[in-house]
Amino acid sequence: MVKLWYNCQGDAETPEYYIYNDRTRIGWIKNVDEDGYIDEILIYNSYRNMGYGKEALIALMNLEKRDLKLDVKVDNEQAMRCYLKVGFVPCEAWHQSKRDYIGMIWKN
């Protein structure tokens, strides 16, 4: 079962949440800002395609209790499938400077 551990250090270089499966760190979520924009989600390579990203996003949705937004590269089909499975829907990219990205939003 995936759990999120909140990192209270709170600087921009440190992940806001670490993702654990049992006692093993398997990834992190970086910077969920005041508007609900998620800067980056990473599941370590050896733990991909096992459903952990989906479980981590569901845990984050349950914690945050608000709309969440992110940008994903258009060619990152694996991440796109994960976001769609948990209820994110495509929209315009949140940061216009990211031309090869598509925005995703989850409405709480």
Task: Identify the residue ranges that each predicted region occupies.
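Acetyl-CoA-dependent GNAT
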Residues: 1-46, 94
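Conserved active-site alpha-helix within GNAT-family acetyltransferase domains
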Residues: 75-92, 97-100
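Active-site acidic-Proline motif in GNAT/NAT acetyltransferases
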Residues: 44-46, 50, 74-75
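Short, well-ordered alpha-helices that flank and scaffold nucleotide-derived cofactor binding pockets
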Residues: 58-62, 85
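Short hydrophobic/aromatic beta-strand or adjacent loop that forms the aromatic wall/cage
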Residues: 14-16, 99-104
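Residue-level recognition of conserved beta-strand positions in structured domain cores
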Residues: 40-42, 72, 106
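Conserved acetyl-CoA pyrophosphate-binding loop and the N-cap/start of the following alpha-helix
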Residues: 47, 51-59
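Conserved GNAT acetyl-CoA-binding A-motif
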Residues: 64-75
